[in-house]
Every structure is written in structure tokens, then in C-alpha cells.
């Protein structure tokens, strides 16, 4: 056998051996800015599961705009679990028969292991003096957000702005619609996802304000330094939930229901909740929520 063929054979044997090391493989289809959360969570769960069952798990991730992700699952992406940032995306899968109709009752807290809220990220010194939603709809302002139709981040921005407009004197659906329309016209572009929006604002330098999850703001501070921007908490915003579900059609086909269920249940464990808090999400565990009082 020549050297080239030997090299190919070695690579193939390595791939077979690597695959054989895992007793099962799970794919988690998740929203864009959850990369860091599950990068930390997966090794933690693998260690727990190995100690409990003796099984080795291979855990894979797929990330993107929440609505794009569920459409990919509906189109054949074989995700064992979905971990999203808006309930209507999981309802979409339930309507397709991929997720149980009562998915929100399968786990505690309506199947949302942690929460967050929406904040404004502005340049150092807040040069345009942004304080609340009305400032962002003013002429000449550029806002950076992901597309409201494709992402939970963008949709929660839309809903928070709508809710704020309704609370104003004389507020009604018509005035809220007009206000949100003005706000969205101030977006020079719609980012593909939450992390893309962060890159657009922080690295490309586009826009006057980035609207994003509170948790993403903390990740920006970690990566870019707190001195390079400021965080503004508007007077009213939506509590963002992050629902999870098992993709029944996939786990039944692969025989991974036991592992997939445990993977999601562990999000509510002390370790899982601590990981959420370490990634700047608001845990459901009241003791941990108190511990991380900066929320």
C-alpha cells in the first residue's frame, strides 16, 4: 500500500474509532447567541451522564436565528432537542407534528429554564443621550437589531417597543403600530441573528444603538471591555423566556429519547442553573437569582 493510501486508511480508521467512542449522539438546534451557554453546558452534562449511566455522549450544536432554526428542523435537520428564545417557534414545530402539543408542560416553568430582558447598548458616553424607546424612533437615529421575522431577539425588540407605546398616554394598537413602524425604519439593515447584530455594532461600527438581550450585553462586556460602551435599561421591556423541547420524531427514530430528556432536565439542576447565571442569564433557582443580584 502506498503512502497516500496508508494516510487515507489511517484517517478513516480514526473517524470510525472516534464515532465508536460515543454511545449516542444528540444535536441541539438553538438560537444564535446561545453558543456560549451550551459550549459550557455540554461538557458538564456529558460528565454527569457518564457518571450516572456509564454512557458516552457526543453533543452537537446548530445555531442561527430562532425562526430559521425551527424551519430547518421542519425541513429535515435531525435535531433531538430545540432550545429557542420564543415559544411561537416551538409551537410551529408542534403544529408540524414534530414536537408534542403539550411541550410546555413537559418541563418546569413552561419549559423555560431561564429568562432575560431587552436592553440598549450605546457607544461610550451615550453621545446621543438615549434613555427610552421614544429616543430610538427619533429622526436620524440608527438602530441595530436582528430581523423580527426570523429571530427571537428581533421579535422581543418589536414586542417590547409595542408594549411601551401602549403604556403611553392615549396609547392604543394604532399608535403602537405607528411607533414601531417609525422605530424599524431607523434600522439601516436587519442582522441575520443576535450575534451578527453584535458584530455589526461592535466590530463594524454601524448604528447608534444595539438592542439585545441583557445576557448578550454582559458577553459584550467580557469580549470588548466595559469601557467601550454603556448599557441602558429602558423603562419597560418584555421578560424573555427561552423554551426548550424534545423533537419527538427525531428521538423516536434515533432511539435517543432517554438522553434527550435528561439533557433538557439537567438545565434545571443546580449545575445547569449556575451555568445559566455564569452566562448572564436569569436562573429560575431563587437562591442563585439572589446570588447573582446584579440582574
Regions found by a protein language model. Name each.
Residues 7-19:
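Bacterial N-terminal signal peptides
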Residues 23-151, 289-294:
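N-terminal segment of the mature folded domain
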Residues 29-31, 122-124, 142-169, 183-187, ...:
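Short beta-strand->loop
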Residues 42-51, 74-78, 87, 94-98, ...:
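Sec-exported extracytoplasmic/periplasmic mature domains
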Residues 112-116, 177-184, 191-192, 224-257, ...:
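Periplasmic-binding protein-like
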Residues 125-131, 150, 163-171, 250-258:
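Short helix-loop capping/hinge motifs at secondary-structure junctions, enriched
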Residues 168-235:
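Ligand-binding pocket segment of bilobal, Venus flytrap-like solute-binding proteins
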Residues 250-295:
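Extracellular/periplasmic juxtamembrane helices and adjacent flexible linkers that interface
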Amino acid at each position: 500500500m502506498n503512502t497516500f493510501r496508508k494516510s487515507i486508511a489511517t484517517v478513516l480508521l480514526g473517524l470510525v474509532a472516534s464515532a465508536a467512542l460515543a454511545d449516542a449522539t444528540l444535536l441541539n438546534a438553538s438560537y444564535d447567541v446561545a453558543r456560549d451557554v451550551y459550549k459550557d453546558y455540554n461538557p458538564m452534562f456529558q460528565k454527569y451522564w457518564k457518571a450516572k449511566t456509564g454512557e458516552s455522549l457526543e453533543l452537537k450544536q446548530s445555531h442561527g436565528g430562532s425562526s430559521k432554526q425551527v424551519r430547518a428542523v421542519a425541513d429535515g435537520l435531525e435535531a433531538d432537542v430545540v432550545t429557542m428564545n420564543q415559544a411561537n417557534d416551538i409551537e410551529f414545530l408542534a403544529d408540524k407534528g414534530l414536537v408534542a402539543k403539550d411541550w410546555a408542560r413537559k418541563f418546569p416553568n413552561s419549559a423555560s429554564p431561564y429568562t432575560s430582558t431587552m436592553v440598549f447598548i450605546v457607544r461610550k458616553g451615550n453621545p446621543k443621550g438615549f434613555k427610552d424607546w421614544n429616543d430610538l424612533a427619533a429622526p436620524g437615529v440608527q438602530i441595530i437589531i436582528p430581523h423580527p421575522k426570523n429571530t427571537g431577539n428581533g421579535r422581543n425588540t418589536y414586542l417590547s417597543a409595542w408594549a411601551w407605546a401602549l403604556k403611553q398616554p392615549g396609547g392604543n394598537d394604532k399608535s403602537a403600530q405607528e411607533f414601531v413602524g417609525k422605530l424599524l425604519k431607523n434600522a439601516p439593515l436587519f442582522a441575520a441573528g443576535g450575534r451578527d447584530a453584535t458584530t455589526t455594532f461592535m466590530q463594524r461600527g454601524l448604528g447608534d444603538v444595539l438592542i439585545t438581550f441583557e445576557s448578550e450585553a454582559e458577553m459584550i462586556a467580557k469580549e470588548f471591555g466595559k469601557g467601550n460602551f454603556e448599557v441602558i435599561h429602558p423603562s419597560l421591556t418584555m421578560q424573555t423566556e427561552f423554551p426548550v423541547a424534545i423533537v419527538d420524531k427525531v428521538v423516536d427514530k434515533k432511539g435517543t429519547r432517554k438522553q434527550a430528556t435528561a439533557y433538557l432536565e439537567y438545565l434545571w439542576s443546580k449545575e445547569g442553573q449556575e451555568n445559566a447565571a455564569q452566562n448572564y442569564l436569569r436562573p429560575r433557582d431563587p437562591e442563585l437569582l439572589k446570588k447573582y443580584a446584579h440582574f
